[in-house]
């Protein structure tokens, strides 16, 4: 199966939402393209004295609801189309979450794993200096993404403050605690997945207690989703990472599985249960499936064999459009990525507000705010789906996109843009 062009996929999803809402074609034409895309050349001197150039981008899709917001990724396969698509998805994610943000995304085509610490810092500073004219506390607020972390955000912050000759701590989120970040940021996406899943389980499965869960992907999102779902009463029976997985119907301890992964390199070395592949985990007889690894793992080739009643998308784009049509017919409920994994950007908003007010907030207070937002958003999408769509024909993703696109459209209309 050929991977889908992410921009084609993003535009197809937008087209479907516009058609379901009954909007004119011009709405699609306006929203199918970003407000602007800046391409930059990042040239640095390597440790061995050679000079290398890397391409980078910042896409600003739409700011009708507020400043652009979205992460920056470092990856050898980043393309401009991917960055544009991701910025579009951030517009819908922020809109659906009820946050005062538009959508933005950045990327640099580089393999950060082969850079020295000095090279990584230089690359980060040069990239952020190159985009400094279009980002800002009230303009565009980047955050961590693939292979970027709080240290990279610290370099971004410092470089921006050097260029702008001020102290603008809200220009990026996902920072270390010492620079105005929040400890709760690391758990936020996984916790949000767990909360959204709990709301859906209470509505459609009679609750989470004793419900079996399989988690594909055991990085930050997968681990914390498993940890919090277990604390909420679910039984984790399978976990996997890129090197394999483990299935034990008697239950798996999420924290023990993490220790095994850290000490041996993979959760597949967990002391009990049956070893499985990272794709086999998708087809296990469980109540809830959490794909939290990579995109396009649930396809029209395996959708028929999926036995879960609820799929909660911890990863971005794990379910293809063709697969979702099959799942809808089977009656499988898919909590879409723009709903289920919005915990990270919601926590980023809490951090941003805190930075702007010069205030402070405890981790417990931050997680409580996040929980309230995730519960509210999940209930809103489910209610809209039941009230305005046909569950046997339409997915929760349809409902989520319709809500998100309608909010952006109304904001643009009110502001006189269209």
UniProtKB/Swiss-Prot annotation:
Residues that bind NAD(+): 217-223
Record carries keyword DNA repair: no
UniProt xrefs under SMART domains: ELFV_dehydrog
Active site per UniProt: 105
Domain of life: Archaea
GO BP, sorted A to Z: glutamate catabolic process
InterPro entries listed in its UniProt record: Aminoacid_DH-like_N_sf, Glu/Leu/Phe/Val/Trp_DH, Glu/Leu/Phe/Val/Trp_DH_C, Glu/Leu/Phe/Val/Trp_DH_dimer, Glu/Leu/Phe/Val_DH_AS, Glu_DH, NAD(P)-bd_dom_sf, NAD_bind_Glu_DH
Reaction catalyzed: L-glutamate + NAD(+) + H2O = 2-oxoglutarate + NH4(+) + NADH + H(+); L-glutamate + NADP(+) + H2O = 2-oxoglutarate + NH4(+) + NADPH + H(+)
GO molecular function: glutamate dehydrogenase (NAD+) activity; glutamate dehydrogenase (NADP+) activity
GO cellular component, one term: cytoplasm
EC number(s) stated in the UniProt entry for this protein: 1.4.1.3
Record's subcellular location: Cytoplasm
Keywords of the record: Cytoplasm, NAD, NADP, Oxidoreductase
Assembly behavior: Homohexamer.
UniProt-recorded name of the protein: Glutamate dehydrogenase
Primary gene name: gdhA
